[in-house]
Amino acid sequence: LLYLFIVPPWQHYDEPGHFEHAWLIANRPTLPQPGDFDPAMRRTVAASMIEHDFYRGGAPPDLSQPDPLPIGLSQIDDYVAYYWLAALPLRFLQDADITHQLYATRMVSLLLFLLSIAGCWGAIRELTQPNNSLRWLLPMCLALLPAFADIMTAANNDSAAIAFSTWLIWGIVRLIQRGFSWVWLMGCAIGSVACLWSKTTTFPVVAGLALALPLSLLRGRGRWLVWAVAAATTLFIGATIIQWDDARGWFRASNQEAGVRRAVSQTPVGQYAFALESSAGSGMQIQQVIAPELTEALRGQTVTLGMWGWTDSQEPQSGYLPVLLIATTQGVPDTSSPYQKILLTTQPTYYSITTTLPENTARLWLALTAPVKPAKATTTSTLFLDEISLTKRVANGIDLPGNFVINSSAEFGVVRFRSSWQTPFAQLLRADPNHFVGALLDPHTRSIYISKFMNLSLQTFWARFAWGHVALRNPGLNLLLNFILVSGFLSSSCAVSSQLVANRGNLSIHTVHTLIVLGLISFGVCIAAIARANYILFLGSWFPSARYIYPAVMPVLLAVVGGWVMLFRQITPHHSQPFGEWVILALFASLNIYSLISIVQFYA
């Protein structure tokens, strides 16, 4: 309840947009459609945002400007389950102050917070023996997890997605532990629908039901048939939706049906070349992320961009030399090197251009572009590019040896989602899945991607608040919290593995299957969260990514807390076993109090 009131109005991520969706449902007879807004409501919200110092350090909007007045990212196209619930109290508060209406919406999220804790209690109760301390410890730790409490008391659709996912996990655990039940199957079906109408982050949890149902029906050795079928199905689907014809280290900024890496007989270097298609109304661009240390080395320097280029068309085709996209802050590119147009023929020809980078260059991307043809064009042409180069030029006009471009001749390939699958996966993840796959399979971008995501997700899992910009007063605590999380995971993994190998009697076969399903659900949720975070490669903005992991917060927190319970039982005398549980609870309570102090001091 403290988090609900202690964070100022509108100071949760996208809270104005989430509130707007619920408000439109409450005040209109039909569901809002993308693009809908109420001018008077937006002005009232903007005035409230100004009143509560939302724009401190920035420029507030001019309330007299023409409609639509911006109040943040619109959420009208989001799934509606949360907004239906949030609209219920607003129907009775239509004449109330807009800030009071926001707090009423936050109260709905608070109720969903309580439902999440109840779902966690139900799931751990099914999974453990009556005297197991995790039955009371895990729900209390969840209630005291600061960043989770902050998310679950904000006006946002994550609260519904997390609450419904936690209850569905309870149903999944019960089905596997106790066997098939029509009542619980119906409950899981209702929970699945609620999840699917809440947010796409819940989809891996819903997929877990596809494993739980056959496992609830097969109670003997036949259960392993379920895993065999699941593995075979996964391999078949994987082989169906992916292909190996893109260039490693290069990311699509637009889409074409064919791969961008193609074997060509006349390449100046190697056996492959980049193949970018150009047609009426459609061009193609691929980009490479320049590593931060290379960006720093090139800042303010004169560089040469070069390439070999040709086309498969008998008519000369327009193309561009490589372009450097430049960000002078940690955000998106705000300038670039010149777009130098060239004419390509069937004969491979070398082209180059020299440019000087700004002294304040913060981030760099190298782009290869096939331009859009005129509207009257009826054919599609392929532009072939090879041996892309980025070199530093010294004062006497000589280029230093050493190419800064990775995989400059497309000799190394990488898998990608087929174009027919890329679009639905991108809509599901709100991000291009090929960026995620390409980043993980490229050793040069993998370290950037994973290190930034891990730092981002670990902080936001424990204690990062509001729009992700409010941190603990002492940043050094993050190292301790990360140690606690990783150690808990390792401890629980070792404990479960040792029991499976040394003494199966301590874990029932039902519990083994349940833990596997929970592990797969957590893995799926985390992979989806990592995929959503591919903006790390192209943007510098802060996103509270742990909210994408919270639909699986129950099994994730179980691994952390359960691991530390087992550690304490190894290092404390047998007669003082509850000591470890009380230490863990005290840690969560202390972190919670310190988090509240940090929030109060930030907004003071």
What do these predicted regions represent?
Residues 27-105, 257-263, 418-459, 463:
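Interfacial juxtamembrane loops and adjacent helix segments
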Residues 96-99, 120-144:
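Transmembrane-helix signature of polytopic, membrane-embedded enzymes
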Residues 104-128, 167, 491-494:
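Transmembrane-helix motifs of polytopic, lipid-linked glycan transferases
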Residues 119-122, 160-178, 186, 190-192, ...:
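Specific aromatic-rich, kink-prone transmembrane helix
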Residues 176-177, 205-237, 502, 507:
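Perimembrane helix-loop-helix junctions
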Residues 184-199, 206:
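Membrane-interface alpha helices of multi-pass inner-membrane proteins
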Residues 229-477:
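Extracellular and organelle-lumenal recognition/adhesion modules and their flexible linkers in secreted
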Residues 462-516, 520, 560:
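Hydrophobic, aromatic-rich transmembrane alpha-helices
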